[in-house]
Amino acid sequence: MKIKVLLIGIVLTQQLHAQSYQKMHNKAIVVDTHNDILMQAADKGIVFDRDLTGITYSDLARWKKGGLDVQVFSVYCDGDKKNAYAYANREMDSLDAVVARNPDKIVKVFSYADLLKAVKQHKIAAMFGVEGGHMIEDDLGKLDSLYKRGARYLTLTHNIAPSWATSAADEASPNPSKGGALDSSRRKGLTDFGKQVVQRMNQLGMLIDVSHAGDQTFWDIIKATTKPIIASHSSVYSLVPHRRNLKDDQIKAIAKNGGVIQVNFNPGFIDSSFGKKETAFLTKYAAEYDSLMKTGKLEWYSMDYLYKKYAAETNTMRPPLSMLIEHIEYIIKLVDVDYVGLGSDFDGINITPQQLDDVTTYPLITKALVDKGYSKKDITKILGGNFLRVLKANEVK
């Protein structure tokens, strides 16, 4: 009898705990600053107001199930793609079509006030983040146009950078085939035009995103901007020394600037052992990978195909959720809780951490933070409050 009572007590405690973190999650404004599903919408005709379970990590119904309130949709194409600006507009069109079909579920927002109104109406607040300065094609007028369509941040450089800002890949790799390389005549950092881009973004109230930026570009941005900046999807270099992650002095500089670091879920950025696992996997299936590439598939889609085909093997490579939490905690301990948030990179990454199987699983992050002893106030900041502060601070008054 005593054992039965004890078991009932344990079950009730677990249920109360689940209700507690779920209630906290539901009351917070949950923001994800980086999701790449628009790339698949443009490339493959994916329509994400349908059930895409097993195909993508995201769709409209699953965002709602995961308690997501604000999604920044990445507008991205490779840096060497022709007509990048036209492609950006195609991606934007795909979101606009979903919004038009589902006005009761999702709305495009252009301001902090719009966002709060959408959340109050229980609609997903959607905005764009343009991933890569190459998409403005060296034209400030095109930057203005993308802003008018709802782009509220610009990632100044992707791996293959524009002519006016060097990327982390540029500054780290001497080999163009590795995703970026510097011409011997080209200086690192922002050019004069790059500084004009920063100035124009400050004038518009458009957030400057330093994810993918090279070190010199980062410091040039810090010097040039008059507004708080973001890293829309980056993690911690001291934990995983990957060129895409932020070093301690950069994290401190973002905090001093009043900005925010949105932690990326990419296993390669949060687990120092993942690179070796991935290399071994791709070596094992090299012939199949090469065959896929020869059919004209992009690298991302070729890898995605293999990871899904060999899902059982892929699953053993996934880092635990606790590793993502370690990156969040590292930033908190280094600079305080006011400067960290979530930038998942869902549908831009091929593998996710364990438990984070798709966008329905955001509440498990809240649970992990509750289990770590963080207060409701601090968790609310991490889930979205910190990003909202930066968004509001950038708006032109």
What are these language model-derived features?
Residues 2-4, 152, 200, 233, ...:
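Basic side chains
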Residues 9, 227-228, 259-260:
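Conserved active-site beta-strand-loop modules that form the wall/rim of enzyme catalytic pockets
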Residues 19-184, 241-397:
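N-terminal hydrophobic targeting/anchoring segments and the immediately downstream early-domain regions
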Residues 149-230, 235-244:
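Divalent metal-binding pocket/active-site signature
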Residues 1-24:
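Bacterial Sec-dependent N-terminal signal peptides
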Residues 12-14, 44, 219, 243:
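Alpha-helical transmembrane segments and their juxtamembrane interfaces
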